Curated annotation (Swiss-Prot):
Main subcellular location of this protein, as a coarse class: cytoplasm
Protein family membership: Belongs to the methyltransferase superfamily. RsmJ family.
Function noted in UniProt: Specifically methylates the guanosine in position 1516 of 16S rRNA.
Catalytic activities: guanosine(1516) in 16S rRNA + S-adenosyl-L-methionine = N(2)-methylguanosine(1516) in 16S rRNA + S-adenosyl-L-homocysteine + H(+)
Keyword presence, Transferase: yes
Gene3D superfamilies in alphabetical order: Vaccinia Virus protein VP39 (3.40.50.150), YhiQ-like domain (3.40.1630.10)
EC number: 2.1.1.242
Annotated residues for binding of S-adenosyl-L-methionine: 101-102, 117-118, 153-154, 171
Native source organism of the sequence: Salmonella heidelberg (strain SL476)
UniProt-recorded Gene Ontology molecular function terms: rRNA (guanine-N2-)-methyltransferase activity
Keywords: Cytoplasm, Methyltransferase, rRNA processing, S-adenosyl-L-methionine, Transferase
Protein name according to UniProt: Ribosomal RNA small subunit methyltransferase J
Alphabetized Pfam families for the sequence: SAM_MT
InterPro entries: 16SrRNA_methylTrfase_J, SAM-dependent_MTases_sf
Phylogenetic lineage: Bacteria, Pseudomonadati, Pseudomonadota, Gammaproteobacteria, Enterobacterales
Length: 252
């Protein structure tokens, strides 16, 4: 995949070359999207809109730390949607990981989560965030146990992941109508990089075959159900819907 690769660390240790080789990235000086190594983290920038700033994954500080400490925990809609109850903490495959926010929330309340991400740039951002998270004295211990990244396409991986998870979580990219600053910023940068998930409808059936309990699909409240398969089971929040579908139980 072609993208502009930039190193702002001042180091000469070849880290950028290692990064490019690991994720299959090719430097393109004229690409409007840039993956930048800064002294703090790896970030994605839209070069023709510098005011949008950089997008990076941070499980330790910022909004994620605030959500972990002061958010709803088990009371969050995503936790309710996957079925967390009492001692039941399902094993989850997040097949459209993105920046890993929902996966992190589930891991922080005790679920083991395998994140799948097919875009190499997004996977590199996630890996960078995980590396810093794993090294953190506060959250590193449980984060290593519960949150894992697998760089694959969900369309093929969902048929051969083992062991089977109890829940598959899907949050495919869908054009946002909201004008909130964060959504606007992230979506503009993300849509420029990966575009909408035009093949997302193809995820529902393999997800239902893989999950032993349920599939949860996060949708904007104005979006039709994934693959136009309606379900009476949903958790509705302001702006979003978590559609719930039955999985395929394990056979003896």
């Amino acid at each position: 995949m072609q993208i502009c690769l930039m190193d702002e660390t001042g180091a000469t240790d070849g880290a950028l070359s290692v990064l490019a080789a690991r994720w299959g990235l090719e430097h393109d000086e004229d690409n409007p999207m840039a993956l930048v190594l800064t002294p703090q983290h790896l970030e994605l920038r839209k070069r023709d809109e510098p005011k949008l700033g950089g997008i990076f994954v941070d499980f330790v500080g910022g909004a994620m730390a605030h959500r972990r400490k002061f958010g709803g925990g088990r009371g969050e809609a995503v936790a309710k949607a996957v079925g967390i109850k009492g001692d039941y903490l399902p094993d989850v495959v997040d097949a459209t990981a993105g920046l890993g926010r929902d996966a992190f929330v589930l891991a922080s309340v005790g679920c083991r989560v395998r994140m799948l991400e097919r875009n190499p740039v997004v996977a590199a951002l996630l890996d960078d965030g995980l590396t810093r998270g794993y090294a953190d004295a506060d959250i590193g211990g449980w984060l290593q146990e519960r949150l894992q990244l697998i760089h694959v396409s969900s369309l093929t991986a969902l048929t051969d992941i083992t062991p089977r998870p109890q829940v598959v979580y899907l949050d495919p990219m869908f054009p946002h109508r909201q004008k909130s600053a964060l959504v606007k910023k992230e979506m503009r940068v993300f849509q420029s990089l990966v575009g909408p998930d035009l093949d997302a409808d193809g995820l529902l059936e393999p997800a239902r075959q893989l999950a032993t309990k349920r599939v949860v699909v996060k949708r904007p409240d104005y979006a039709p159900p994934l693959a136009d398969v309606a379900t009476p089971n949903a958790i509705v929040t302001k702006g979003h819907r978590f559609d719930i579908y039955a999985g395929t139980p394990l056979t003896e």
